[in-house]
């Protein structure tokens, strides 16, 4: 009897308690056998060996047909091999396909006690136990065998411990899985809340966009009648333009016919003899044209009568043809070189607020300055002594322009009005009201009967001085119209706008004839050269462009930025272009050589610049309320 390894003290105490209470058989025999096999215990078994008799051995008979030795191989080794193979085949055939079930025999009580005593080293107790145990067996007391099997407590404990460990591992895994699931749940809840909030925000934005869309639809619907009226007006104006062009062609033909008739009449008066023949020949030649000319004359008279009855009898008439431009007689290249060596000569503080405009009287050495202090002043040159001060506007002045005769002055203001002043008396003789926002610029027509103005309300207006009303409103710009000017001695207008375009208009019809594109920023000013061949414009980033007015194409672009160009002006020869810049510098551009000269003298922004009639003196106004003279 022997034991493989020792037992723990706790197991011994459990065993002693079980023996003291009387052991009873319990547990499943198969589970106990598995536990004992896992423990590796040894068993004590009594075996009686009897001597076997060879006479009682039963030999297996092998049939001759199943055991035969081939010819030529009748030796002992072959015979033994054949016999073994035959026996193996028979055993395989007789073997059952179903494996026998495993039967575990539990450890008997006496073997268990003996193993326990040996492990504990209790040899004397073991001797006493064995003596008494075998003595009882010899006496025939066999009731002890019927007690039954004692369950293997140690094996059960080990199994329970293993199961407990496995359960703890499973519990740990489940806790980890639960923690991970909790984290995932929190993350999913946060994402759910985020997406819910995002969804609510999107729903609110969608509802807002829907409301805005509805408002825009209503807004656009309110514009449809206006657009329809404008389209009708546009078509009407186009028809009127076509009729006007046809009538103009007819009038030109009539004038040419009259001129030829006058020439023939003059020839007839100079030669009295053949006067009758000439008259008869003229009558024969003009016989087909006579009724036509007569009909045209009658139609014109009827149209004039209808116009007088239908319109305002005080309305002025635009000149039919372009008037001769006296500046065209000036030589293209002046014999004297252009002047660029201007130096600051005098500084006159005339206004308390920035100077917005200075302008020269057309025929005399008189200068007018306008300021944001709501005043305009007439200055006598060259000392710039104040001759007259005018006031009447309720807001800052933006621009001024002399009547072609020089006896009247037009001023534009931030109070949305244009006023006409009598320079002899210094009184306001007329006020034009119609713009909805500040008026930026004004200009006189060469005939002196019309004043044009441009405004922050994206429109320009043409005012009739005689009828004292607005004759036409020019629509087309999409932003503030910053400047306006009449082409010299014609009915053509030039406007510059914050929508980065220049527009050319027919003042008689109010139709935009052409738009010029090229500036990338708001255009602050645009002006014709004295001969009317070029246009100069400057924008809010200091870029100055020259345009060919005859071809309506850009000539050159000059970047003098980044300070804005506030105003541009030509000298009387048209060779020098001056630009007043936002950094206080006056730039002089030589149009012949392309050189740029700078005049430094303004401490702050330079708002306006103008040349004297002879080009020897330059006047500039700045944001400090001063007018400076350069010579």
Curated annotation (Swiss-Prot):
Record-linked CDD domains: WD40 (cd00200)
- Compositionally biased region (Basic and acidic residues): 277-287, 295-304
Q: Which InterPro entries match?
A: G-protein_beta_WD-40_rep (IPR020472), WD-F-box_domain-protein (IPR050995), WD40/YVTN_repeat-like_dom_sf (IPR015943), WD40_repeat_CS (IPR019775), WD40_repeat_dom_sf (IPR036322), WD40_rpt (IPR001680)
Q: Which residues form a coiled coil?
A: 152-267
Query: What PTMs does it carry?
Result: Phosphorylated by TSSK2.
Which cysteines pair up through disulfides? They are none
Q: What tissues harbor this protein? A: Isoform 1 is detected in testis. Isoform 4 is detected in testis and brain, and at lower levels in kidney, heart, pancreas, thyroid, ovary, adrenal gland, spinal cord, trachea and liver.
Region annotation (Disordered) maps to 266-332
Location comes to: Cytoplasm; Cytoplasm, Cytoskeleton, Flagellum axoneme; Cytoplasm, Cytoskeleton, Cilium axoneme; Cell projection, Cilium, Flagellum
Record's keyword terms, sorted: Cell projection, Cilium, Cilium biogenesis/degradation, Coiled coil, Cytoplasm, Cytoskeleton, Flagellum, Phosphoprotein, Repeat, WD repeat
Q: Name one GO cellular component term.
A: axoneme
Instruction: Indicate the secretion signal residues.
Output: none
Q: Where are WD repeat segments found?
A: 350-389, 392-431, 434-473, 476-515, 518-557, 560-600, 601-630
Question: In Gene Ontology terms, what is a biological process of this protein?
Answer: cilium assembly
Where does it mainly reside? cytoplasm
Question: What is the protein's known function?
Answer: Necessary for sperm flagellar function. Plays a role in motile ciliogenesis. May help to recruit STK36 to the cilium or apical surface of the cell to initiate subsequent steps of construction of the central pair apparatus of motile cilia.
Q: What is this protein called?
A: Sperm-associated antigen 16 protein
The source organism is Homo sapiens (Human)
């Amino acid at each position: 009897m022997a034991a493989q390894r020792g037992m723990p003290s706790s197991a011994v105490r459990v065993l002693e308690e079980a023996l003291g209470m009387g052991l009873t058989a319990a547990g499943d025999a198969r589970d106990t056998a598995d536990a004992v096999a896992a423990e590796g215990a040894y068993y004590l078994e009594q075996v009686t060996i009897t001597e076997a008799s060879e006479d009682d051995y039963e030999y297996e008979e092998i049939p001759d047909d199943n055991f035969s030795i081939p010819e030529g191989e009748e030796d002992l080794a072959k015979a033994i091999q054949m016999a073994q193979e035959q026996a193996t085949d028979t055993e395989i055939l007789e073997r059952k396909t179903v494996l026998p079930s495993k039967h575990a025999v539990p450890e008997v009580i006496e073997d268990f006690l003996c193993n326990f005593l040996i492990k504990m080293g209790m040899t004397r107790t073991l001797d006493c136990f064995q003596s008494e145990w075998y003595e009882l067996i010899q006496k025939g007391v066999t009731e002890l065998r019927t007690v039954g099997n004692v369950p293997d407590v140690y094996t059960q404990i080990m199994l329970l411990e293993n199961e407990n460990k496995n359960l703890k591992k499973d519990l740990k895994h489940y806790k980890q899985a639960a923690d991970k699931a909790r984290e995932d749940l929190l993350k999913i809840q946060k994402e759910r809340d985020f997406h819910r909030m995002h969804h609510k925000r999107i729903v609110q934005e969608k509802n807002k966009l829907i409301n805005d869309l509805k408002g825009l639809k209503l807004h656009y619907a309110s514009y449809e009648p206006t657009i329809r009226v404008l389209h009708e007006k546009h078509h009407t104006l186009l028809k009127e333009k076509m009729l006007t062009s046809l009538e103009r062609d007819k009038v030109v033909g009539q004038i040419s016919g009259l001129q030829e008739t006058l020439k023939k009449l003059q020839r007839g008066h100079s030669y009295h003899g053949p006067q009758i023949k000439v008259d008869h020949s003229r009558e024969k030649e003009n016989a087909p044209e006579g009724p036509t000319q007569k009909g045209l004359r009658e139609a014109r008279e009827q149209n004039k009568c209808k116009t007088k009855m239908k319109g305002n009898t005080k309305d002025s008439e635009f000149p039919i043809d372009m008037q001769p431009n006296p500046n065209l007689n000036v030589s293209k290249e002046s014999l004297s070189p252009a002047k660029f060596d201007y130096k600051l000569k005098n500084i006159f503080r005339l206004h308390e607020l920035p100077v917005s405009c200075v302008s020269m009287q057309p025929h005399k050495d008189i200068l007018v300055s306008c300021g944001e202090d709501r005043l305009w002043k007439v200055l006598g040159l060259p000392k710039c002594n104040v001759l007259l001060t005018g006031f009447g506007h309720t807001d800052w002045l933006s621009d001024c322009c002399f009547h072609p005769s020089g006896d009247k002055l037009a001023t534009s203001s931030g109070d949305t009005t244009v006023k006409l002043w009598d320079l002899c008396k210094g009184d306001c003789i007329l006020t034009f009201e119609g713009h909805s926002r500040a008026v930026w610029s004004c200009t006189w027509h060469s005939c002196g009967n019309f004043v044009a103005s441009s405004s922050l309300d994206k429109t320009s207006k043409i005012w009739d001085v005689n009828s004292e009303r607005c004759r036409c409103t020019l629509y087309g710009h999409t932003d503030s119209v910053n400047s306006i000017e009449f082409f010299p001695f014609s009915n053509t207008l030039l406007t510059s706008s914050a929508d980065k375009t220049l527009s050319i208009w027919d003042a008689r019809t109010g139709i935009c004839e052409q738009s010029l594109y090229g500036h990338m920023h708001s255009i602050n000013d645009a002006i014709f050269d004295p001969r009317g061949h070029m246009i100069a414009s400057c924008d809010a980033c200091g870029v100055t462009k020259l345009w060919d007015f005859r071809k309506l194409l850009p000539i050159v672009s000059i970047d003098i930025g980044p300070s804005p160009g506030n105003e541009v002006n030509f000298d009387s020869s048209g060779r020098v272009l001056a630009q007043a810049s936002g950094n206080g510098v006056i730039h002089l551009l030589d149009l012949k050589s392309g050189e740029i000269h700078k005049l430094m003298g303004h401490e702050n922004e330079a708002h306006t610049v103008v040349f004297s009639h002879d080009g020897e003196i330059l006047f500039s106004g700045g944001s400090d309320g001063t007018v400076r003279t350069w010579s």
